[in-house]
Design a protein with these regions (language model features):
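Cytoplasmic helix-loop-helix junction between adjacent transmembrane helices
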Residues: 108-146
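C-terminal ends and interior cores of transmembrane alpha-helices
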Residues: 84-99
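Helix-loop boundary and gating motifs at the non-cytosolic
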Residues: 1-56
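Hydrophobic core of transmembrane alpha-helices in multi-pass small-molecule transporters
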Residues: 9, 89, 102-117
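Central cavity-lining transmembrane alpha-helices of secondary-active solute carriers
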Residues: 48-67, 148
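Helix-loop-helix hairpin linking two adjacent transmembrane segments in secondary transporters
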Residues: 142-199
Length: 206
């Protein structure tokens, strides 16, 4: 359950983690602005709308395909490959910010959306191992992971993108934190989750 919980959590983390980074990508004077100098703020907002929308769009398109693949090849390999793809998507997005490359941003979000379709696989795996007695509880845990990822995504994105900011008076964030830090963090988290799937998650498809 831990591996499945983490998978769903990271998928939804990817939806919210971008929200606090948005202004940095289009604001005048921001060191992480990716839009050309000639673009208006409205044009930047339109670009951000497409950038946010491409993620759920590709989840919608990919979820049935990944679900069918998991029925044929098994839950474990499809989960592992898709989670690794999520890590790559985060890394591509971080590079896109660093290089102010808008196409890379869209590629990263699209790949993250495609691999984020593994929620269907995660739910299928839960169905495989659940009994009539614990089915509702197990799917409730997955729902909690869904909500937690969506809630913490914006918070993590905001915290990790701010250099030298006080953390409730306890310490300051490192001065090398930037708009790319949340995505490198999510990429590393995804790789750890991939290792968790490969090492500890048994195949559930009978």
């Amino acid at each position: 359950m831990l591996a499945i919980f983490t998978t769903v959590f990271i998928d939804m983390l990817g939806f919210g983690i971008l929200i606090p980074v948005y202004p940095l990508l289009i604001s005048e004077g921001s060191p992480f602005r990716v839009t050309p100098e000639g673009w208006s703020f409205t044009q930047g907002l339109i670009m951000l709308g497409w950038l946010q929308g491409i993620f759920p769009l590709f989840i919608f398109l990919a979820a049935p395909i990944l679900g069918q693949m998991s029925d044929r090849y098994g839950r474990r390999p499809v989960l592992a490959v898709s989670i690794f793809g999520t890590a790559v998507g985060y890394a591509i997005f971080a590079v896109g910010i660093s290089t102010a490359n808008i196409p890379l941003l869209f590629i990263g979000r699209a790949l993250d959306g495609i691999t984020g379709g593994n929620q269907a696989v995660a739910q299928a795996a839960i169905g495989d191992v659940s009994t009539n007695e614990n089915r509702a509880k197990n799917f409730g845990v997955i729902g909690a992971a869904f909500g937690l990822g969506f809630i913490l995504g914006p918070y993590i994105g905001g915290r990790l993108s701010g250099p030298d900011k006080s953390f409730y008076g306890l310490f300051n964030t490192p001065d090398w934190f930037s708009a790319t830090t949340p995505f490198w963090f999510a990429a590393i988290l995804s790789l750890c989750n991939c290792a968790l799937i490969l090492c500890f998650f048994p195949e559930t498809l009978k």
